[in-house]
Amino acid sequence: MFKQKLIGKFFTGINYWGSENAINMWEDFDIKSIENDFKVMKDAGITHLRIFPLWSVFQPLKALYGPSEVYEYGFGEGKRPDTPAGRAGVSEDACEKFEAFCALADKYDFKLVVGLITGHMSFRTYTPPAFEGKELLSDPTVIKWQLRFVKYFVTRFRDIDAIIGWDLGNETCNMPGLGSNPDAYYVWSSTIADAIRVCDGTRPIISGLDYSTIENGPNNYKTIGEMCDIHTVHPYNIFQTEADPLTTMKPILDLPFRCALGEDISGVPTFVQEFGSIGYMNCSRRTEADFYRCCLLTSLAHGCHGVMWWCAFDQGHLTYAPYRWNTIGSDYGFFDKNLEPKPIVEENIRFKERLSLIPGEVLPPHTKNAGVLIPRDDGGITMDTLRASYMLAKQANLDVTFKYAPDTIPDSPLYIFPSISSHKSIPAESFNQLIDKVRNGAVLYISADSGLIRSIPEITGISIAYRERINAVRTISFDGQKLPVNTEYMYKIESSDAEILATDETNEPVFFKYRLGKGAVYFLTLPLEKHLGTQLGAFLKDDIPNYSVKYRELAAESGAERVADCENRVIRLTEHRVDENS
């Protein structure tokens, strides 16, 4: 399969801009400097580079106007040559530099992921002069020239062995042009992807995206698999998990959480294409190296395929935009501006030595014994809630798959439906499938937030007299733990045929277990996962109660068994089956 050009052995890669000229490297091209970069990256154990032929340099079109409209698109004031490159609006000079770059990469045995429409980089838009101020993702004229560029570029370089994948471009959803209709991005990315496939059907198309929603929004997980062969995540601590120190559970597990969510919902392999510490106000160099080591091992264990650090070399000394705009970092390379290695380099070398001892340099898939059902994406679910559910499961010695509730419900011994906050969380057909699986022996856990499910009395064995908005903290007493949970609603129980497992401080029942056919339904009237998703220190502080006792109850009921466990809440395990016997 052509995906195996990238997805196979676990890889460690890096996002590359030249050490001397960074984003300006194609204009101020210095092959000797690039070779010096390659030498130190090779010695550091890097095998994969993500590279960026800057759109504004490789297709440097200028619109030359007559009295009222564009008369022609030229190269500066000059006419485009009547050649394949010229007709595509592509700079022959830039392509020759790219050719030399690829030849050098081949010499050092680097594998290249090429970002094709690199119009967004480090929070700056790079567009050919002709298209400045245009809607880059939806203007028909712009897309026409993008297609010409892609077709010419891919056709010209498709025979270069070092290239193993075509990236749509760096975080292309951040380019202007989405407008009010999120489907504009689907049309744009599908159009670009189809053009790539026409010219080269031997390499995977990679999304290059940083962040995705579930179903709503322009670059959502549900449609990514229709456009691309491989999906990506860019999980930066300062944007998603900034409340916790880098080397703690939440920032580290955010990588496999995001990969699992992306892969399970999109249906295509998903890897960590960008991540980093983002500079030394966020951490020290030693902390950065410790973070990198933890992320490597965690990503390997959870089947994340590979990781690529942002970025190769420090850039904080550069004085042109966007670097002069950037006050959050830019000094986040593997190497400093003088090509001196940081402690992170030694961690990469040590990891690659360990990896070489594993047959095939990849672990067997880790076993999964539960499913997290994602409520319908109508604005009622957050990544914080899903991440908290994922982490509670890890603490309970469970590994989960993610499934979107409106889809066909797959078999699983345990279903986790966390913090329901939407009145349309699951369609009736899917819900009936789910309950049938419970009647046949599965375990279902539902925790309530503001959403309503009409069948709750029938499937939980409880009668709810009323609910009241209280916006207060309720403390659950369960398994020797006192577990405070912030809740918007209180549910007053009128009667119960279910087993009451826990009450709050007012002696109001809040946690129930009800036999349903051969299976069981657990119901919690409090939004445990939503609370922990935003609770400071929830997966960090030693004095935080052990909320995972709830999920351990679910694991025990569902018969989840592992060959090993650990009492420490932040030291977790994965289980990998080599064969039927081991």
Show which residues each predicted segment covers.
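Active-site mouth of glycoside hydrolases
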Residues: 2-228
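A conserved amphipathic helix/loop scaffold
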Residues: 423-582
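Aromatic-Pro/Gly-enriched surface loop or interdomain linker
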Residues: 343-414
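Glycoside hydrolase catalytic-domain groove-lining segments
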Residues: 183-187, 191, 198-281, 314, ...
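Aromatic-rich peripheral "rim/lid" segments of glycoside hydrolase catalytic domains that contact
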Residues: 310-369
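Alpha-helical scaffolding within the catalytic cores
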Residues: 33-37, 148-154, 211-224, 250-261, ...
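Structural recognition of the beta-strand scaffold that forms the well-ordered cores
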Residues: 11-15, 48-53, 112-115, 164-168, ...
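Active-site clefts of carbohydrate-active enzymes
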Residues: 18, 170-182, 235-245, 255-294, ...
